[in-house]
A protein has these predicted regions:
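Interface amphipathic segments
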Residues: 1-62, 70-75, 79-167, 173-225
């Protein structure tokens, strides 16, 4: 059976599917090609919770699907174009790199893929996610990455500047991930959290509730004792 479908948004083709479905072939009924000249991401915001991420930009690429619907074999490559991810919880917007994300036999491979901070420093991702058995093997690294960049305003729960160095690995099945690594907060980090609905007794004890201390600061350590 021959298949053909197209999706257009605002008069422009965003996605098309062409190929065949072989109903009598139980081993390999799918033979489809998915072309994505430019799938806008902003419409997806309508289906996301208000406090989740907000997307802009587009997804582009080309995929082939073979095998069965229960166990498809996906190959191809995708990349983001002009894409930004706004995180309302921390009021900060990150850019997504334009590097190709290769999909090989249903394995999504990241090679130096970048998430770009407001200060233009990248967090890089290497490794793969295997959708056949939903397992991950990722390495994440960042240097001087600005993870918060928010001016103080009446609506902000979090404001300030935050910078970090990070090295981490993410491995295992998606429902049993093992995450290991280190995160170093850098000089210049000053982040404030506003407790908007805290009970009065908690507000009265809020000062110095959390204190970050440098272990190389021997004066502070002696005072703590």
């Amino acid at each position: 059976q021959q298949l053909s479908a197209k999706l257009s948004l605002d008069g422009a083709e965003a996605l098309s599917v062409d190929g065949v479905y072989r109903g009598g072939d139980t081993e390999n009924p799918l033979g489809l090609t998915v072309s994505i000249p430019g799938l806008p991401l902003a419409p997806a915001n309508a289906f996301l919770p208000p406090d989740a991420v907000r997307l802009s930009g587009a997804l582009q690429g080309k995929l082939t699907l073979a095998g069965t619907s229960a166990k498809p074999k996906i190959d191809g490559a995708l990349h983001f174009a002009g894409t930004q991810v706004q995180v309302p919880m921390i009021g900060t917007t990150f850019g997504l790199g334009t590097e190709k994300i290769v999909i090989d036999s249903s394995r999504v491979r990241f090679t130096g893929y970048r998430i770009i901070a407001p200060n233009k420093k990248p967090l890089t991702i290497d490794g793969e996610v295997d959708f056949a058995d939903i397992t991950t093997d990722l390495r994440i690294a960042a240097t001087d990455f600005q993870f918060i960049n928010v001016a103080k305003n009446r609506g902000s729960m979090v404001y300030g500047q935050g910078y970090m160095d990070m090295e981490a690995t993410v491995k295992g099945e998606i429902d049993d991930l093992m995450i290991r690594g280190s995160v170093d907060l850098l000089r210049g980090t000053e982040v404030n959290y506003v407790m908007q609905d805290a009970p009065p007794e908690l507000k009265n004890r809020a000062q110095n509730m959390v204190t970050f201390v440098s272990f190389s600061d021997t004066v502070s350590q002696r005072q703590d004792r």
